[in-house]
Amino acid sequence: MTTISTDQVAAIARLARLAPDEAQLATFARQFGDILGYMEMLNGLDTTGVEPLYSPVQHATALRSDETAPRCTREDVLRNAPEADSEFFIVPRIV
């Protein structure tokens, strides 16, 4: 079974701008390990002769009519940003 350390989970959380506590890091590490173990099990399956699917169901997706809905204001959206000025998100420089 694949294991993932709490340090690896903390690094992933930092990238996602999350701040889990130590108990949550341990829980997430166990859950990530379970997920990766399941993926390893799926990788071990013999899929010879199985036709690839783009969807598990055979019917087409039903379309719905477009409807207008209330929108968030710029202030509402920027209020949830870790850092913003009056009009834009402020993000770390990448290059």
Swiss-Prot record:
InterPro entries: Asp/Glu-ADT_sf_sub_c (IPR036113), GatC (IPR003837). It is an enzyme of class 6 (ligase). It catalyses: L-glutamyl-tRNA(Gln) + L-glutamine + ATP + H2O = L-glutaminyl-tRNA(Gln) + L-glutamate + ADP + phosphate + H(+); L-aspartyl-tRNA(Asn) + L-glutamine + ATP + H2O = L-asparaginyl-tRNA(Asn) + L-glutamate + ADP + phosphate + 2 H(+). The keyword Ligase applies. Keywords: ATP-binding, Ligase, Nucleotide-binding, Protein biosynthesis. Its EC number is 6.3.5.-. SUPFAM superfamilies: Glu-tRNAGln amidotransferase C subunit. GO terms for biological process: glutaminyl-tRNAGln biosynthesis via transamidation; regulation of translational fidelity; translation. One of its GO terms (molecular function) is glutaminyl-tRNA synthase (glutamine-hydrolyzing) activity. The keyword ATP-binding applies. Belongs to the GatC family. HAMAP family: GatC. Allows the formation of correctly charged Asn-tRNA(Asn) or Gln-tRNA(Gln) through the transamidation of misacylated Asp-tRNA(Asn) or Glu-tRNA(Gln) in organisms which lack either or both of asparaginyl-tRNA or glutaminyl-tRNA synthetases. The reaction takes place in the presence of glutamine and ATP through an activated phospho-Asp-tRNA(Asn) or phospho-Glu-tRNA(Gln). Heterotrimer of A, B and C subunits. PANTHER family: GLUTAMYL-TRNA(GLN) AMIDOTRANSFERASE SUBUNIT C, MITOCHONDRIAL (PTHR15004:SF0). This is Aspartyl/glutamyl-tRNA(Asn/Gln) amidotransferase subunit C.
